C-alpha cells in the first residue's frame, strides 16, 4: 500500500511537471494581441489629463486598434479588488487565458503585498503616485504620472498608492494563476461575495468575447 501511494505521488508530481512545461512552451510560442510597450505608450500619452477623460480616450483608442477584443460599454464595470492587504478598484477591458488589460486605481491611500505571479504585469500611471519596495532591498521608489512600473514573473514587492492614483495595467502570462491572490481576501477576509460574483462575471464575459472573436477570425461566424 505504501509503495502504491508513493508511486501515485511520483506520478502526480511528474504529471504536474509535464503540464507546467507544456504551459511554459505554449506561453513562449503563442502570439499575443497586445504588448507592454503599446499599452505603456498609449497610457503615457494621456497621463496628466483628468483621469476619467484619459480613461475614455484610452478605451476609444484600444477599440480602434483592436476591434473585437475590448468589452463594450454595457459590460464595463468598476469592481472592488481586495488583495494582499490593499483595496482598489478595477475596470476590466480585455481578458483571455494569457493577457489582460484593465484600468486600476484607488480613491483612498492604500498599500500591501503585490502578490507573486506566473505573469508579467506592467502599470502606467495616469495620476497620483505609486510607491514600490522591492524584495531584497532596503529602500522604496516612488513613481509618478507617465511612469511605467514592471512587475516581473515571480517577483514580490510592497506596494503603496496615494489617494487619487489611477493607472492602466497590462498583464501577460498564465492569467488564471493570478486569480487565487486576487480573490483570496474577498473569500477569506471580506467575504464580499457580491464582488466575487462581479469579478467572475466580467472575466467570463471577456473570455466569451475572445472566444467569439477568435471563432469569427477562423470563419465560423
From Swiss-Prot:
Main location: nucleus
Keywords: Cytoplasmic vesicle, Endoplasmic reticulum, Lipid transport, Membrane, Nucleus, Receptor, Transmembrane, Transmembrane helix, Transport
Entry superkingdom: Eukaryota
Keyword field contains Transmembrane helix: yes
Residue spans, topological domain Cytoplasmic: 28-221
Positions of region (Important for ligand-binding): 96-103
Gene Ontology CC: cytoplasmic vesicle; endoplasmic reticulum; endoplasmic reticulum membrane; membrane; nuclear inner membrane; nuclear outer membrane
An example Gene Ontology biological process: lipid transport
Topology Lumenal: residue spans: 1-4
Annotated localization: Nucleus inner membrane; Nucleus outer membrane; Nucleus envelope; Cytoplasmic vesicle
Membrane topology: Single-pass membrane protein
Site note Important for ligand binding, residues: 123, 169
Stored InterPro entries: ERG2_sigma1_rcpt-like (IPR006716)
Residue stretches spanning the membrane: 5-27
Membrane in keyword set: yes
Pfam families, A to Z: ERG2_Sigma1R
Region (C-terminal hydrophobic region): 174-221
UniProt miscellaneous comment: Sigma receptors are classified into two subtypes (Sigma-1 and Sigma-2) based on their different pharmacological profile.
Free-text note on domains in this protein's UniProt record: The C-terminal helices form a flat, hydrophobic surface that is probably tightly associated with the cytosolic surface of the endoplasmic reticulum membrane.
Family in the record: Belongs to the ERG2 family.
Function noted in UniProt: May function in lipid transport from the endoplasmic reticulum and be involved in a wide array of cellular functions probably through regulation of the biogenesis of lipid microdomains at the plasma membrane. May regulate calcium efflux at the endoplasmic reticulum.
Known partners and oligomeric status: Homotrimer.
Name the UniProt record assigns to this protein: Sigma non-opioid intracellular receptor 1
Organism: Xenopus laevis
